[in-house]
């Protein structure tokens, strides 16, 4: 079974491998040992559950045709259980998200849009569910702003969705903001997205966005800044009435 008790099936085996001093499954003399092998291929569901638990039961007949059987021990008597305990293979959960927000197109005058792309990648080893993206937008002076649209789910790699984001897959969201005169006066906008979701144990997993530019010396959790340079100009006309 998996660590949560869900039924599983071995990929192969148990298969007879060898017997000491010629012992076989057909005839196992006292003091002799038979060896069997088996294997299981790890699945994402097993990782999400935290691993696998396994028990083998050996059975045979004595000379009086009575059934003789024994349930397996895990071979580790230091665990406090010296007989008939599951062989447990634990797989530790390492949930993690990586969020990047970039401005894919920008304008410089009132009414122009700033379009954003937000990517959320599952960089851990367990599936993350119920992914959401929250956004914090301010002008360059720190004044609070609100996105014109989004964040809106756009796509997921290999069928990934906000409801279920497997390891290694990425969700893409879009958002936009329409430039105002106040934003131009402030010198631009600063934006941060925070992606959150739940791991299989229902723990919250979150990550604050990086701007996608590691050349700026800040490789993680830095704001996406869109600067709008001030262009001061006057046009004065004087006419004689």
State where each predicted segment sits.
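Exported/extracytosolic protein signature
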Residues: 1-241
């Amino acid at each position: 079974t998996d660590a949560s008790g869900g039924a599983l099936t071995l990929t192969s085996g148990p298969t007879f491998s060898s017997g000491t001093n010629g012992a076989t499954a057909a005839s196992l003399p006292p003091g002799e040992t038979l060896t069997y092998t088996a294997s299981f291929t790890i699945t994402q569901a097993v990782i999400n559950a935290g691993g696998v638990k396994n028990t083998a039961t050996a059975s045979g007949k004595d000379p009086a045709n009575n059934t003789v059987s024994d349930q397996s021990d895990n071979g580790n008597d230091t665990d406090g259980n010296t007989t008939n305990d599951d062989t447990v293979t634990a797989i530790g959960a390492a949930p993690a998200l990586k969020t990047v927000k970039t401005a894919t197109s920008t304008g410089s005058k009132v009414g122009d849009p700033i379009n954003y792309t937000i990517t959320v990648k599952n960089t851990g080893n367990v599936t993350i569910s119920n992914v959401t993206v929250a956004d914090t937008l301010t002008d360059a002076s720190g004044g609070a702003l609100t996105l014109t649209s989004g964040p809106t789910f756009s796509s997921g790699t290999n069928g990934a969705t906000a409801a279920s984001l497997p390891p290694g897959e990425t969700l893409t969201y879009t958002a936009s903001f329409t430039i105002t005169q106040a934003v131009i006066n402030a010198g631009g906008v600063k934006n941060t997205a925070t992606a959150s979701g739940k791991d299989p144990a229902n723990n919250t997993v979150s990550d604050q966005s990086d701007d996608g530019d590691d050349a700026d010396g800040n490789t993680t959790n830095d704001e996406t800044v869109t600067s709008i340079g001030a262009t001061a100009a006057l046009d004065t006309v004087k006419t004689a009435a």
